[in-house]
Amino acid sequence: SSQANFDVHPYGRPGIGSIEDLNAATLDDVKAFHAAYYRPDNAVLVVSGNFDQKQLDAWVDKYFGPLVSPKRPIARVTAVEPAHAAPKSLTVYAPNVPLPAVMISWPAPAASSPDVAAWQILDAILQRGQSSRLYQSLVYEQKLAAQVGSIMEIRQQPGAYSLVAILSNGKSVDEGLKSLQA
């Protein structure tokens, strides 16, 4: 969905770049990227399971305590995705995909927006579980889709909200789009 939703912003690219980007990167490019982003103030340590807290604290101090954050700030993305003047369509074909799928996306707020909670409630009502409105309508009543879902990209900058339907055998993309838009 990101590729279709973002023309300018890096959200529209894979996290590590395309194969072409990776193949074109020099050793100096990789070292510079590592120095810029792989640093203590841009990392998160996650520990789960049954462990001894004192032992964990000792290991964290031993292995991570000596690491020093650089004095320079982390470069942040400042690109702004312009509003789309017209709806966009993207068709993707892939091998071994037994059923067609359709997706419709809308701009979504940034994570800092007070509207995020309302979007999360909307998402739960529309598509969470077999009692959700989309599931009831598209899967049970219309028998149009085998599965429905959503992708909510709530990020640091404005993201996207997408509704997805994997269509039932014999159903057309046009039928799927019409039902998602209803």
Model-predicted regions and their roles:
Residues 27-63:
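Non-catalytic, conformational "gating/processing" segments within enzyme and secreted inhibitor domains
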